[in-house]
Amino acid sequence: MRRISPTRFLLYIVLIFLAAWYLLPIWSAITTSTKTGEQVALTTPVQFVFPPTFDPYREAFRELKRPILNSLIFTTFATIFSTILGSIAGFTIAKLVRGRVSRQLLALISFGIFLPYQSILIPLVKIISSLGLYNRILGLILTHTAYGIPITTLLFTNYYYEIPDELVEAAKIDGADPWKIYTKVILPLSKAPFVVTGIYQFTNIWNDYLFGVVLTRGEEAMPATVKLANLKGSFVANWNIQMAGALIVALPTLLIMIALGKYLIRGYTSGALKG
């Protein structure tokens, strides 16, 4: 039997403690979401009550059904659009624009990543309102697409820098135009960055609260995150319903990570974030 050194044993203890501390809020949310209102008041947050009740989940889902559908619609479309546009922009910068201009253009586009969203809220609301897209799902799609392009462009550009220029030059010699080079040469090599960028964008857009609360009112286009923040009673907070709602809203991103997690790791290790 292999002996464990005292240093390694101590490291394991620390890691187990940190993992338990990290998972404690999730466990608290699960236990609270399976209690009645009276049980929430009479027990500690980490205490599990048997038998559990699932009435809070039914109540939370009834309240969140429309906002979750709204979030699924605009998150899916904004993720697709921003990822595709970022890929095309990344190909253009990395393979069509050469030299210093390429790096300068990438730096200019990447500036949008560091621009605080709060600083552009007033002009954003005015623009969206003037287009007749306030409180519309299309307005959220356009907003998240526009503000996703800088990060998707950066990720794709750094990946495309790693693809040998000889492949592009060979395609040009064969008479391929830029679009054919992109679709026939670059795109088949882009599975890794598409998975990484798609998961990143979907998670960020799904979890966004700021744009949702500023650009919507009522439930016609309200995202799930905004409705979740309002999921409380008039005078008393229904913690069991709120915790059930939080777990329901977290479910889509969790399922995506479970389904595509192995591709995400492959994307990282294959250089999707290199550069």
UniProtKB/Swiss-Prot annotation:
Keyword Transport: yes
Record domain ABC transmembrane type-1: where: 68-260
Protein topology in the membrane: Multi-pass membrane protein
Protein name: Probable ABC transporter permease protein PH1216
InterPro entries: MetI-like, MetI-like_sf
One GO process term, biological-process aspect: transmembrane transport
Role, per record: Probably part of a binding-protein-dependent transport system PH1214/15/16. Probably responsible for the translocation of the substrate across the membrane.
Keyword field: Cell membrane, Membrane, Transmembrane, Transmembrane helix, Transport
